[in-house]
Amino acid sequence: MHILVVSVNYRTAPVEFREKLTFQAAELERAMTTLQNQKSVLENVIVSTCNRTEIYAVVDQLHTGRYYIKKFLADWFQLEIEEVAPYLTIFEQDGAIDHLFRVTCGLDSMVVGETQILGQIKDSFLEAQQVKATGTIFNELFKQVITLAKRAHSETTIGESAMSVSYAAVELGKKIFGELTDCHVLILGAGKMGELALQNLYGSGARKVTVMNRTLSKAEVMAEKYMGHAKPLSELQCALLEADILISSTGASDYVITKEMMTKVEKMRSGRPLFMVDIAVPRDIDPAIDELEGSFLYDIDDLQGVVEANRAERLKEAEKIQFMIEEEIVLFKTWLSTLGVVPLISALRDKALAIQSETMESLERKIPNLSDRERKVISKHTKSIINQLLKDPILVAKEIAAEEGADEKLALFAKIFDLEMEDVESRAEEVEHKRAWTPSVPSL
């Protein structure tokens, strides 16, 4: 079994390409189900955000797994593998495990230490569980990763100086306008990104706020929380006439604001500038609008400069979290190494229980007048003796499994206890067969 990550992210691909490889929320479960049926893929979780699309997979062979995951991405987005490959980063084994920990803890984010990615990873994992795309390995790994990420944010101050991308957009607006009290702010999109932007705007003094969304009721709910106004998207052109700051994150598949629309709006704005931030992927605003004299457009990649402002302080805390990650990886790898010894332990227990059962049958033949209570007491105590005798050998077997040359040592272990290796290997095959269909872990 091998753990593999295939990543397209803000470090390796511009937004123009990332938006071509973005899974919509509604299609994520279908995508993971499709990927699960690909050759070599045993488990998978797909994470798709504005800054990254990543496939986490357990595969039976690294080379085969890499190829079929690349092919899946290309086929799904109707591209050629040659078009996709230059933008992919691939992590394998320890590197893949470390990458997942770092991403979930916010250490690989554009804004180091942001917490939004933790929720996105958790949501993707739970969706993968629902479609039975995860098994023994990922159920354990993702549970461990999510738990550590929560602990990292509670035990360090990285979140205090960290910013989400939406917060970075607000900071950029403050640098341009100074105080936001008198600015008319227009929010397009009532999703998580839009609400995060509105929270930060409100916290920075903005009070003239309009929220627009395709579903007006959602815009009304969000606007009411922050004493703003809600309008339907059909009134967008009029709203653009009044706005000073526009932050857009609708999740639409096409441009919500076109250059043609903005050209008409500019003529009626009497030279007033409009600061526009597009934090959607795919983008909501036609990038050609930046050519217009009165429109100042920034997309998600342009926010990198704002993000750097608090970077030094966050990196100090990131070092602490990286140390926590390394400790956790050791624990996971130790657990992973013991999976191979499970069939051996199972065979040892079964042999011991068979001896106990034969002993009880012999005892009952020799002492036929035992009461039910006496049988239960004797059975309980003989099983207790077995458990105590097996406790140390089982611990030793688990320790051996984590050492170099484990196969030879475990073979000797099996020989000492006269265990049939064919039986052990048969049990191992059953474990591998069932691994991808392990019941979901409890909700995190």
UniProtKB/Swiss-Prot annotation:
Residue numbers binding NADP(+): 189-194
InterPro entries: 4pyrrol_synth_GluRdtase, 4pyrrol_synth_GluRdtase_dimer, 4pyrrol_synth_GluRdtase_N, GluRdtase_CS, GluRdtase_dimer_dom_sf, GluRdtase_N_sf, NAD(P)-bd_dom_sf, Shikm_DH/Glu-tRNA_Rdtase
Function: Catalyzes the NADPH-dependent reduction of glutamyl-tRNA(Glu) to glutamate 1-semialdehyde (GSA).
Enzyme Commission number(s) of this protein: 1.2.1.70
Methyltransferase listed as a keyword: no
Entry keyword annotation includes Oxidoreductase: yes
Similarity remark: Belongs to the glutamyl-tRNA reductase family.
Other remarks in the entry: During catalysis, the active site Cys acts as a nucleophile attacking the alpha-carbonyl group of tRNA-bound glutamate with the formation of a thioester intermediate between enzyme and glutamate, and the concomitant release of tRNA(Glu). The thioester intermediate is finally reduced by direct hydride transfer from NADPH, to form the product GSA.
Catalysed reaction, written as an equation: (S)-4-amino-5-oxopentanoate + tRNA(Glu) + NADP(+) = L-glutamyl-tRNA(Glu) + NADPH + H(+)
HAMAP family on file: Glu_tRNA_reductase
Source species: Bacillus cereus (strain 03BB102)
Entry domain remark: Possesses an unusual extended V-shaped dimeric structure with each monomer consisting of three distinct domains arranged along a curved 'spinal' alpha-helix. The N-terminal catalytic domain specifically recognizes the glutamate moiety of the substrate. The second domain is the NADPH-binding domain, and the third C-terminal domain is responsible for dimerization.
Active site positions: 50
Protein name: Glutamyl-tRNA reductase
Domain of life: Bacteria
Biological or metabolic pathway of the protein: Porphyrin-containing compound metabolism; protoporphyrin-IX biosynthesis; 5-aminolevulinate from L-glutamyl-tRNA(Glu): step 1/2
Site for Important for activity, residues: 99
Top EC class of this enzyme: oxidoreductase
CDD domains linked: NAD_bind_Glutamyl_tRNA_reduct
GO process annotations (BP): protoporphyrinogen IX biosynthetic process
Binding, substrate: 49-52, 109, 114-116, 120
Sorted UniProt keywords: NADP, Oxidoreductase, Porphyrin biosynthesis
